[in-house]
Amino acid sequence: MTQEKRNLHKAPPDGGWGWMIVIGCFFVTVCTRAVTRCISIFFVEFQSYFAQDYARTAWIHSIVDCSTMLCAPIGSYVSNHFSCQVGIILGGVLASTGLVLSSFATSLEYLYLTLGVLTGLGFALCYSPAIAMVGKYFEKRKALAYGIAMSGSGIGTFILAPVVQLLIEQFSWRGALLILGGFVSNLCVCGALMRPITLKEDSLHYPLKQEQMENEPTQSGRLDSSCSPLCQDCSHKRLCYCTKKEYSFLLKPKFMVLAVSFLFLAYGCSPPFVYLVPYALNVGVSNQEAAFLMSILGIIDIVGNITFGWVTDTRFLKKHRYCCYLIAVGLDGLCCLFLPILTRFQLLVPFSVMFGYFDGAYVALIPVVTGDVVGTSSLSSALGVVFFLHAVPYLVSPPIAGWLVDTTGDYTAAFLLSGFSMIFCAVLLALAKIINRIKKRPKAVAVPTSDIKQEIWTNGDVSCANAINQKEV
């Protein structure tokens, strides 16, 4: 009881242990998103070893991303009903096990199950709960906190990309996966940092006090059989009410538009990460230079995370986060449209810089914009839904892009489709913003003509009109 009172806050503390939460979330994104990105470095190795085409090999990366996003609501459920610590530690065990088992793969189908499903499920149990915890600890500096936390994806990619390439060269792809499995087990340590916090806003959804529940202890969480049917019925209704309240944001028009836009965003953002290295190798870039492109993308991703988070926390831009987000998405899509004409390493470097910056910018704002729409109390559940919506696009976009590469013989169609998808996402959000602004304009109040008598005076040059309420005459 004392611990619960100590952890009950009227508002997010905006500091204190919150910075440890940011550090924990930072390493969660390193071990989940950065490792997922680095799986694309194994692409050529898998394709060569198993003698498969682009489309079949691309399913590995797709299934990892899809499993991570598809199972995100499970991560939110475990976080909401048990604790964030339990979810992340369990996820760390599953993800590490999946990577270790993948090192013994004998076929692509084996990798689909271990590297794809099992590792993806582990990442799902870690990712959304860790991100939601940052939102519970920060309000005024939320975008900056998220920028630092989400920069783990970029920093991790910058460091891990050349390291993974070196591990493959020294120990083969099997040894590299085994070492990555040990590295990902650090998610269990990150989970231990996630100290629970209860906000006053959250406690309003659970009106029964702890003392009231302690007076009548129950076994196994069940009501005693001597309880009246009315008591049991009230308990059931309260559970249903809490569940409905937890997901009431699904009916908000703003969230619906945001949800649809995520489908196009998720489709567009995945292929560039999967096919940047194979594309670079295809145009004559060396293995180390191709891996270095991913490192550049990763380090600039960090700059985008932190600078965009800091800038959008300023007084002037704080109320325009939504617009900053859609601009970043649109510019990221525009970068993809130019990628097919960049055929030298010197030209691919600027692409990695621009694409990485805007990718980091909008990724840092996804939980912020979502929180602005649904509120802090529903953020964990909302992020579960948001990442769930990423699942199908993440699953189908790399194989579709791979099919386009196999069919056309180059990467042009794949990158153009990716770019236009992200641009459409930005256009959709912009249209929704414009329509919402038009609806908010104050409407003129019509005055009944039956109660008004109009008198007009004129001097020949200027006419004056005066409305007199007949009821007062």
Curated annotation (Swiss-Prot):
This is Monocarboxylate transporter 12. Keywords: Cell membrane, Membrane, Transmembrane, Transmembrane helix. Coiled coil: none annotated. GO terms for biological process: creatine transmembrane transport; creatinine metabolic process. GO terms for molecular function: creatine transmembrane transporter activity; uniporter activity. The lineage of its organism: Eukaryota, Metazoa, Chordata, Craniata, Vertebrata. It is found in: Cell membrane; Basolateral cell membrane. It comes from the Eukaryota. GO terms for cellular component: basolateral plasma membrane; plasma membrane. It is a multi-pass membrane protein. It catalyses: creatine(in) = creatine(out); guanidinoacetate(in) = guanidinoacetate(out). Residues 1-10, 436-473 are cytoplasmic. InterPro entries: MFS (IPR011701), MFS_dom (IPR020846), MFS_trans_sf (IPR036259), Proton-linked_MCT (IPR050327). The chain crosses the membrane at residues 11-31, 58-78, 86-106, 115-135, 148-168, 177-197, 257-277, 291-311, 322-342, 349-369, 385-405, 415-435. Belongs to the major facilitator superfamily. Monocarboxylate porter (TC 2.A.1.13) family. PANTHER family: MONOCARBOXYLATE TRANSPORTER, MONOCARBOXYLATE TRANSPORTER 12. Functions as a transporter for creatine and as well for its precursor guanidinoacetate. Transport of creatine and GAA is independent of resting membrane potential and extracellular Na(+), Cl(-), or pH. Contributes to the process of creatine biosynthesis and distribution.
